[in-house]
Amino acid sequence: MGDAMDFDDSAALLEQVNRALENATPLRIQGANSKAFLGRIVGGEILDTRAHRGIVSYDPTELVITARCGTPLVELLAVLDASQQMLACEPPAFADDATVGGMVATGLSGPRRPWSGSVRDFVLGTRIITGHGKHLRFGGEVMKNVAGYDLSRLMAGSYGSLGVITEVSLKVLPKPRACLSLSLEMPSEQALLRLAEWGQQPLPISAACHDGRQLHLRLEGGEGSVAAAHDRLGGEPLNSSFWADLNEQHLGFFDEDQPLWRLSVPLNTPPLNLPGEQWLDWGGAQRWLKSTAEAAIIRKVVGDVGGHATCYNHGLIDEPFHPLAPALLHYHRQLKRQLDPRGIFNPGRLYAEL
């Protein structure tokens, strides 16, 4: 895009990977390190992606943007905002210098996720340095091109364990014309029932969170539909900054006085019988739990309803991610061996076996 900060550092990244392959040196891939608290502790030589940055291409009419992995997420969002467009999955940054590569590698999505999709759903194509020492392109840069989608999307949420993402093409969407946030007093049990009921109706809900006392809603869409939904649902006005604070974990609930767990459960799961304080997010499909209960107890309760639990405190437990079933772990190990046969990329970040 011609910015003075644009720089293609892919040759240096490829050289470092090939040197690591020759010497069997594990690599710890990182950008701004803003999400280092997620996953297992990783050793190895640091591969820093931040110098490889810049918007490669952006066509607002095609709803596609392509950026290098070290591009600060805030810069990409500013470019989109100038054209009244957005990343609909609302990825959290957790730091001002968080990178696009880290956004894709962790695959984290914000409050809009159940209504718009995840980071993975918006990945159209990638360029990746593989464990074979090759710099390859997968997928496309237009929405109609489906070649290579699966491999590109596998990078989302892989935590750098399958390769070095050097470039990514993302689908973007127009910003909604109207947005209104509301709060309604009700217990969590009633909130889940109401959300299940509203989910069957054409309401422009784009975020829903219950903080143990109030149900917070965000309405987005055309001015008429948002106004009509407000008239129907009622509620008191809520500052729209609530959603960014929730997404970035700036609210008091997220203060680190107790271990923090992210619980992913089926949408209509009743309140979980676990010690500690819980918030409902994603309309109930994501629960935030602050609890000193043992990991095995939390995962047993969550697993019994078909969900999984991730610990958000770095180094607190040996396995922060929910254990995989044997068949699924076998599949993950096969995939790792195919893409990273020497096992140099973020070894053990997700699981000890990977």
Language-model features: where?
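N-terminal glycine-rich flavin-associated loop
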Residues: G2-I29, T49-D96, L108-E141, P176-M186
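N-terminal accessory segments
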Residues: M1-S34, V302-P326
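C-terminal substrate-binding/cap subdomain adjacent to the FAD-binding core in PCMH-type
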Residues: A105, L124-P259
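Short, conserved charged micro-motifs
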Residues: V74-L76, E189-R194, E223-D231, N268-P275, ...
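Short amphipathic beta-strand starts and helix->beta connectors
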Residues: T49-H52, V164-S169, W198-A207, P271-E277, ...
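Conserved glycine-rich FAD pyrophosphate-binding loop
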Residues: R40-V42, A95, E236-L354
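Short beta-strand
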Residues: R28-I29, S206-D211, Q278-W282, C311
